Amino acid sequence: MSSGGNSSNVNRNSGSSNVITLNDSDEETEDSNLGSSSSTNLCKVCGAEKAALHYGALSCVGCKGFFRRALLKADQLECAANGECTVSVLQKTQCRSCRFNKCLREGMNPAYVRPNRDAPPKPRKPTTTVATCDQTDRGRTTKSREEWMKKMTVEMRTILMTLLNIETKVMKGDTQQEASKLYPLKGIDKLSDIIETPIQLKGKRTEMRYEAYRMAGNDELCAIAYRRLIAAIDWVESLSPLLGHLTPQDKIALVKSSFAPLMVFNFCARTAEACQDENVLCLCNFAYVPRNISKMYEDTYHLGNGLVERALNELVAVYREYGMREEEIVCVNAMICLNPLAKDVSDSLFEKIVELRNRIADCLFSIVKEVRLSPTPNVCYGHILLSLATVTELANAMSENLQFAQTFSNQGEIPLLTDLFGCFTVEPFFKEVDELAAMSLEKAKAEKKKEMSTQTDRLPPPRALLKRQATIDEDSEEPARQNFRLLQPPNNFYITEMLDDLRNNHAENHLISLNFDASNVSNAIASRPSFEDLGTVPSGSTVTRRIGSNIQGPSHLPQCGSTVTQRPTVPSSTTSSTFYNFPPPPGYPPLNAGYTPNVNYPNLYQQPQYFQNFQQNNYPSQVMEQQNYGNVESTSYPFPRNDGFVYNHPNIPYSHHNNSLQQNNFHNQYAN
C-alpha cells in the first residue's frame, strides 16, 4: 500500500481481513453516489427509504401491502378531514383513506394486484382421505352455495341459476284442486294443442312435492302420470329460449323422448333426497307407493311389472348413498330433456342441442368438483352419467306399462297419453264375433250330416259360457271418438276372460257342426215304452238278459242261473234316437234335445248298480203283484220311472255281478 499525504487507509469491514484503500477522490465520488441513490429510492407515498417498483409505482414494502389489502375494502374507507390528511413516514397510519388515495395518485395500478398470491399455502390433504366416490361420506360437504358458486365462471353461474328457476317454476302449482279430480283435462286430446296454445294449462297445474306423507290411492296413479307429462312440457318450453326458435314438431319430439325418463329420474332422485325408508317410493303428490305395490293395489297402472322394486334397488339406493344435491338434479333434468337423438328432431336443431347439452355437462362437472369432498371428482361425475342408462331402461318399461294401461286399465283411456305413444286403432271385437259365428254356421250347414246312431261313444263337449253383453252406446259418443278407439273390452274384464269367450264361441260352432236333429227325438217319459222296448236294441247287436233268482216266472222264461241269447227285432215306429231318452239318475239334469250336458250319460248307465232298485220301485212291484209271469204280456211292463231310485241296495244279491261275460252283456244292453 502507498502511504501518501492525501491518502488514507479505510477499513470498511473491521471484522474482515479484506481492507479497501480509497483515496480522497474516490471517497468524494462514493459520497455523491450515496446521496443521489438515497434521494431516488424513497417511497413516493410515505417517503420511506429502500423503495422499489410495486404495482407500477416506486413504493416501500409497507405501502405495497397496504394497497393490496385496501383494495378488498376500498368502499369502506372514509376520511374525517375531508381528504386533507398528511401522509408521511410517521403519520402514514393516521388516515387509511388519504393514504390509499395517494397510492392511486402516485400510479399504483389495482389491475396489477393478484389476490391470494401472498396467502399461506393450504395444508395438503392426508393420503387417507376418500379416494373414490363409493363411500358414504363422498357426497357430504359443509360448503354453502355462495362459497362454491364464486369459483365458477359467470356463464356457468348463469346457466345454473336459469335451471334452478325452471325447476321452481315447474314444481310450483297454480291451483288448489286435487290432481285426481282435475286430471285428465277435458277437451285436450293432443300434444299439439298444448304446444301451440300453452295458455290452456294456465290454472291447471297442481303443486308437485315428493314426500312420504301418505300412501297414494289406486285412482291417483293415473293423475300422477298426467301431471308428470305437463311437467315435461313445461321443461321443454322453458329450455326452448336457450335453443333459439323451435318448431312445434321439435317440441313434441323432445317431449315424447323425455317424458318417461324425466319421471323415473325425479321419482328416484327426490325419494333419495326426501326419505330414508328403503321400502317406499315417493310420488309427486305428497304420497308414496310401497315396494310390494302389486299386492297392495288392484291396478298398478304405470308402476307394475316390478318397476318400483327395481327403482328402489338400482337407483334410489345409489342416489341416497351418493347424496344428490338440488343443483345436480336440475342439471340432469336438463340433460334428459335435451336429447339430440330424439325421434323426429330436425337437423338444424341437432347441433344446437348438442352445444347446449355440453355446456350444461361442464356446469355439472364444476358443481361436482367444487362441492364434493372426493379428491377424484371425475369419478363422481362418471357415476351420475352412468346411472342414466338405468334410468332409460326403467323408462322403457314404464312406457310399456302405460301403453298397456291405456287399453286394459280400469281407469280408462287418456287421449293425451294415447297421442303421446301413438297407439293403433282397432274396432271393437264384439262385432266381429257375430260375423265369425255366422260364417261358422254356414260352413257347418254345408258339411255332411252325421247320424247319432253311429256316435255310440260320444263324449259331451265342454259347456259353453254365456256371452257377455256389450254396453257401448255408439249414439252417445262423439263422431271424433268413434273414429279413434283403442282395443278395449266391452266391460271391465281381463284379457283371460275375453280369450275364454272366443274359445267358447269356437266350442259352440263345433256343436253346430254336429247338426243335431231335435225333431227325430221323441219324449220317452210321455210314451212309456214297454219292457220289451226297453230291451230292444238296434239290429245286429246281441243282448244277454239275466233274470233274478228270487223272482218266480213262467215256464217259457229261463230260471235263475240260466242265460238266453236272442236277437229281438226293432219296431218300425221306434227310431235309433229313442234309446237315448231314458231318464237320468236323481240329481242330474234331464237329457233333451235343447240341452248340452256336461255328464257322460252313456258311461254312467253302464254302472250295474243303477238297476239294483228293481225290487224297490213301481216297476218290480207291479210285476210282483201278478205272481205269475205267464198272465202278463211282455209288452205291458212299464218303463222304470225316474223317482225313488236306490243305488247299491244291500238286501238284493245279484249273481250276474260275479260273471264278467254276463256283466258285459248287461252293460251293452242299457248302454246302447
Curated annotation (Swiss-Prot):
Gene Ontology molecular function terms on file: DNA-binding transcription factor activity; RNA polymerase II cis-regulatory region sequence-specific DNA binding; zinc ion binding
Coiled-coil stretches are none
List the residue ranges of the region (Disordered).
1-38, 550-577
> Where in this chain does the record put each NR LBD domain?
155-424
Q: Where is the composition biased (Low complexity)?
A: 1-19, 562-577
InterPro entries reported for this sequence: HNF4-like_DBD, NHR-like_dom_sf, Nucl_hrmn_rcpt_lig-bd, Orphan_Nuclear_Rcpt, Znf_hrmn_rcpt, Znf_NHR/GATA
DNA-binding region as annotated in the record? 40-115
Where is the protein found, in the record's own terms?
Nucleus
Domain of life, per UniProt, equals: Eukaryota
GO cellular component term, pick one: nucleus
Keyword list (alphabetical) reads:
DNA-binding, Metal-binding, Nucleus, Receptor, Transcription, Transcription regulation, Zinc, Zinc-finger
Zinc fingers classed as NR C4-type: ranges: 43-63, 79-98
Family statement? Belongs to the nuclear hormone receptor family.
Role: Orphan nuclear receptor.
Q: What is this protein called?
A: Nuclear hormone receptor family member nhr-5
